[in-house]
Amino acid sequence: MRTRPVRFPMEPLNRYKTSRLWNINANIVLADIVSTSATALIIQLLQSKLTTRLVIVTVTAIVDGTISLAVFAGLHTYANRARGITDLFRVQLHRWILSPLHYLVGSGLQFMLLAAGVRAGIGVLVAYLSAVAIVRTIHSLYGKKSGLFH
């Protein structure tokens, strides 16, 4: 009996390249998952050298922001090459405007988790992935209304 090869649906990949809403959110979420995971590992390794909760939260925000910015720029440039660098700056501007909310939620929740005795790396993951979910929802609603995703 002959078996047919397994075929994976290409719909998500097609949507990634054709839908701005899906593309921008996928790039940001992937960049934030990568940056949050890397930051959690870095903070967990450095925790003994970071003297206070405030120092941990501050270093977390700086490391996470730097990694996220670099990863997103690479992903967005790959997926939107035809739109040029100005499109990258336009989307990054929206991210920078929303960054205070992202880091207020992420840092605030991380600080509370540290105060509750949660390990630093786990606190980073919970706090910053929660912040991503909140800010992505707000940005998506704004982007649909403002025309960013057209």
Where are these regions (language model features)?
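Membrane-interacting alpha-helical segments
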Residues: 2-150
